[in-house]
A protein has these predicted regions:
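M16/insulysin-pitrilysin zinc metalloprotease superfamily fold
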Residues: 80-81, 109-145
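Conserved small/polar residues in nucleotide/adenosyl-binding loops
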Residues: 149-150
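M16/MPP (pitrilysin/insulinase) zinc-metallopeptidase core fold and M16-derived inactive scaffolds
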Residues: 42-117
Length: 150
């Protein structure tokens, strides 16, 4: 499979970046910056706090989900059976975070080295969710506590 790569010049930034349309449907934007000592990557999904239903491509009907599920998933995706994503990033020297807005959930990291290893961590944990009944209940409690504070 080939990837469609397009160079785009931004007059606002007076700089160029590349858009890669991956066969999986993922859109990748790359902006190389010569002379910079750190790198940054963000994986964004079009699923945010206002999304309470979705439709899978292999199903006819919509699936309804509780409010707060995007924020819940934002937290859960960092977990794994062995070593959570934050611990994995610490081994590469990267710093990671995530946020949920109305329309998006985004996972990101910055690093001064080991970019490829850090990118592999990002792509791994967002595509390999780890759920157990115990960890789901724990996270539900944390999200519930945050809602009661607001």
């Amino acid at each position: 499979m080939s990837h469609l790569v397009k160079e785009i010049h931004s007059t606002l930034l007076d700089d160029s970046y590349y858009r890669i349309d991956h066969p999986s449907g993922l859109t990748i934007l790359v902006m190389p910056k010569a002379g910079y000592s750190s790198a940054y990557a963000l994986f964004g999904t079009k699923y945010g706090s206002i999304d309470t239903r979705f439709k899978r491509s292999d199903e006819a009907d919509f699936t309804e989900v509780p409010e707060g599920i995007a924020h819940f998933l934002e937290h859960k995706l960092f977990e794994s059976e062995d070593l959570d994503a934050f611990a994995r990033y610490a081994k590469t020297g990267a710093s990671a975070n995530a946020y949920t807005s109305f329309e998006r959930t985004c996972y990101l990291f910055s690093c001064a080295g080991n970019f490829k290893a850090s990118l592999e961590i990002l792509l791994d944990f967002v595509q390999s969710p780890y759920f157990t009944e115990q960890t789901v209940q724990k996270e539900q409690g944390i999200i519930g506590d945050r809602k009661s504070v607001v």
